[in-house]
Each structure stands twice: as structure tokens, then as C-alpha cells.
Amino acid sequence: MAKGKFERTKPHVNVGTIGHVDHGKTTLTAAITTVLTKKFGGEAKDYSQIDNAPEEKARGITINTSHVEYETETRHYAHVDCPGHADYVKNMITGAAQMDGAILVVSAADGPMPQTREHILLARQVGVPYIIVFLNKADMVDDAELLELVEMEVRELLSKYDFPGDDTPIIKGSAKLALEGDQSDIGEPAIFRLAEALDTYIPTPERAVDGTFLMPVEDVFSISGRGTVVTGRVERGIVKVGDEIEIVGLKPTIKTTCTGVEMFRKLLDQGQAGDNVGVLLRGTKREEVERGQVLAKVGSIKPHTKFTAEIYVLGKDEGGRHTPFFNGYRPQFYFRTTDVTGAVELPAGTEMVMPGDNVSISVSLIAPIAMEEGLRFAIREGGRTVGAGVVAKIIE
């Protein structure tokens, strides 16, 4: 018997579990689907279904990720869980599963461990905006003072990486007990407290269509008597006929006006996020626009050449490099629709980067790209993907 039909009317939020190996991320994921399904409908997933994560590709990189979904009173959640540490690193850096918030799972019996720290740092670097903590395995800790000590440690660690440690919701519980239907405070009720924290602490994300207009340029044509048409997929926002827009990146920024929008050979009065459109530009010459630039709302995005980034370097077995690279390495950086060569500066004290590593680097591009913090890119050598990255901070 179906428990009511699936309502698409609830706002949709993307979350995921992060944290140290064996602290209970997958068990918690199973517990959330099992407990919430009983109350709000949907499909429960057991541990083995989640742990057996299928492979997917993002920016030329293979990642194992499990996707589950569940509902609360007010929202619909898509939740990602990864089997291995390397999958987390790849997932967060490629943005394969963009997270509006993360559930950091910390074993109350062990406290914060090296990957706890690394995942918090990664979340900061790749722009995961909110973290909620689930202090798991609370059934294994009899000493209330010890629990409090672990909680303090986690809060300090969050604050260290610029998350609001003092205000972060921390839910104490046991995913294992919750999964078994236990009704004590740390069993099922802990999962409902976690759901409430998700609903209240993570704001509803802005829909792509409500953002400021941005469209990566894929192709440029000139149509005699009508002018220049730029094609691409609108990444966010809306473009209307008559809007003043800017062409940003690679060359000096120029202003132009949208005089027409067409889709499937039909004229429209606007194009919006997700649409593949042709945008007609007034008074713009065919050679003034090229693939790799973006059309954007005036003043909303600037071109930059220098930035710091968090990158993942493909291992040899993933089709990546077979040898390390050193300071001054010059690959191509593939942003949106084009490659730009850039020079890599390694952090002080880092001699070289091995295939399979993740590392923070500084990059200087030979041409400016329309850039914002959180922008994803691939690292390529002659068209072959050797890594992936995300802009952490713009320098100039």
C-alpha cells in the first residue's frame, strides 16, 4: 500500500554525509531513510544497498556515490553517501554532488579523526555552506563528560575552519539503534531531531532560475541582416529581449544588448536556466565573441587570472598521469567550455604532487576567465583529463 503519492511541491535540498572512515556515515544514511520513510513515506534503503555504490563519471573522473532520497514534513532531500575517502575527495572537488549542506558524522567513542578534519577543510574549500553534526555511537559512551568533551572538540575544529562552531547543531545518537527501531533518546528520536535540524538550519537554496543571468558561450554565428547569434545553455537566471548584458572573459569586457532569444528555431521573449538557446546580440561583431566567454548580467561577474584552488589529481589507474608534477607545472584548465593554459604554484614545503593526491594550489592563467569562488574546472594535458578542481579564492 503506497503511503500517499510523491509530492513534487516540497522544496528540494541536496545534502550528504561526510566524516572519518567507520564513524557510521552509511549506517546513518540507512537509518535516516528507514526512520523517515515510516513517517513520511518513500523508500527505505538498507546498509548493503547504500554501501554498494554505483560508479558515475564527473568531469572525466570516475566516482562511486550512493544516492538516496527522503522526505520530511516540509522538504524533499537528495542525499549522497560515498564508500571511500577518495570518493569523498573527488565528489566534493568535482561538484558531482553539489551539497547545500553536509551531515558530519563523528563517532562519540573516537572523537574527531584525520578525515574528520580533512572533510571539514574540503567543505570549506569547495564552498559547502552549512554543516550539521551527528555525534554517532552514543550508545558506546557511558560517560556524559566524555560526550561533552568530544562535542567541544568538534565545535573547535569547525570554528578553526571558519564554520560557526558554537552555533552548529550537534545531534547525539546511535544510527545502529535507530536502524533497529530503538525508541530511547539516542535511537529513532535522534533521527527526527536530525531531520528537524536539516529543515531549520539549512536554508532553502536559491533556484537556478532566480540567480543572476549567466550563459557560457558554446558557439557563435553571424546571420546576415540580423547580427551575431551566441548559443549555449543558460546556467542561471533569465535573459529577456531588450536586456543589457556583458560578454566577459578572455578579452576586455564589452556591453551589448539582447535583441532576440530563440530555442528550437522559435523566437521567445526570454530564455531561462536550463534552456539551450541562441541569443541575438545587437551591434556585436562575430569576432568579438568566442567560445569560453560568458554572457552575464551587467556587473555580476568579473574576469580573473589568479586564484587558489583545491584540486584532485587522477591516479595512474584512473587514466591520469603516471608521474608526479612539480612547481611551475603548466597544464590546461578547462573552464565551462574552453581550455586556458595556467602555471601552477605548489604550497610552501610541497616538493611535488603525486597522481592520486589532493592539494591546494595557486594558479596564474595566461588569459582571464569569468570567475567566481566555487567554480569547477578540469585539468587537462592535450585534451586528456588529468585532474579536477574548484576555485577556492580569487586573488586577482
Swiss-Prot record:
Keywords: Cytoplasm, Elongation factor, GTP-binding, Hydrolase, Magnesium, Metal-binding, Nucleotide-binding, Protein biosynthesis. Transmembrane segments: none annotated. One of its GO terms (cellular component) is cytosol. Residues 10-206 form the tr-type G domain. It is found in: Cytoplasm. GTP binds at residues 19-26, 81-85, 136-139. It is an enzyme of class 3 (hydrolase). Mg(2+) binds at residue 26. InterPro entries: EF-Tu_GTP-bd, EF-Tu_GTPase, EFTu-like_2, EFTU_2, G_TR_CS, P-loop_NTPase, Small_GTP-bd, T_Tr_GTP-bd_dom. Pfam families: GTP_EFTU, GTP_EFTU_D2, GTP_EFTU_D3. Residues 81-84 are annotated as: G3. The keyword Membrane does not apply. One of its GO terms (molecular function) is guanosine tetraphosphate binding. Residues 60-64 are annotated as: G2. Residues 136-139 are annotated as: G4. Belongs to the TRAFAC class translation factor GTPase superfamily. Classic translation factor GTPase family. EF-Tu/EF-1A subfamily. PANTHER family: ELONGATION FACTOR TU, MITOCHONDRIAL, ELONGATION FACTOR TU-RELATED. This is Elongation factor Tu 1.
